[in-house]
Amino acid sequence: MNDSITIGFDAKRIVRNNTGLGSYGRTLVRDLAYLPDSLRLRLYAPDKGRDNLRSQIEGLPRISFCYPKESIFPFEKALWRDAGIVRDLMKDKVQVYHGLSGELPRGIRKSGIKSVVTIHDLIFLRHPEFYPWIDAKIYAWKFRRTIKEADHIIAISECTKRDVLELGQVDPSRVSVVYQSCAPRFTKVPTPVEEEQVRLKYGLPKRFVLNVGTIEQRKNILLGVKAMESLPSDLSLVIVGRHTAYTNQVLEYISAHKLHRRVYILHDVPDADLPALYAQAEAFVYPSVYEGFGIPIIEAISCGLPVVGCTGSCLEEAGGPDSLYVAPDDPEALAAAIRQVLKGAPGREERIQRSRQYIRRFEGNDVARQVLEIYQRIL
């Protein structure tokens, strides 16, 4: 491609969210920035957000951040992101606007600017019980409005695409599956010194399986806690994630069943420490009831861990055929699957190597190239 394309991005989550939507946005924009094509990447955020997140991509080639001109109140920031941003996009001659977190501003279609939206999941429609009633209604309304505005929709898994087609009644030609890549830090092997520093910092046990993700009902980590009762007594579970009200339920179970010496819950863990945490675990456990994709699975496999997940959504797409999957309500089955992938289990190393080969399809350059082809197609 010879002519430069100016791409605008919804960067609110990029500068505010450490995991999930924020991680997706930062990784994709970084991968696009390193393509050899002539691109201008303009990131539109209502404010500068968190320095430690913005700095991960600020200063990369072709990237510039854009903010509202005035010093505005929070409700005005929301209005700007919802509609007012379109004026700035037109002024900046943006050709394609990409809503990275399932939303597009009102009026984007009328402006003549082409638009792409990434839909991560439709859990608020599939499982509204995991959301406050009003939140589920708002998310559903935004989804239906957004798919009418979008020129093209990216689903981050085949599972999400099926949900979009069924629940959004969208023409299949408007939806493409483009998987998510993980941050490059997970492909670098931590040094023994780095591992020991992290072990001492968090007081890690000698043997453990790991879970990473928000500690919420949908993520279902209580199943992992219950599975520990059927696993060797020298094996622990380390849970890394943001606390929610569900965390209290997990803590109550741990206390009632005297598992406090075998279950460790860590929060506010910096991204930089995660590779060393993964590297010291024996396996990764991800018993989520429903996901849009499951990027921690890719991170774990990149770090050389076997994975045990649950059936029922998209986790088989992320983990591939050499990860193990059980029903999300069967702690005994989860315990049995974990036993199959602990150190010393037959075929463990071969399973890890095949899984590493499988996740090559999620490499950042390939993902960025697929997204760029969508931009070019709709122009």
Where do the model's predicted regions map?
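Carbohydrate transferase catalytic cores enriched for Leloir-type hexosyltransferases
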Residues: 1-379
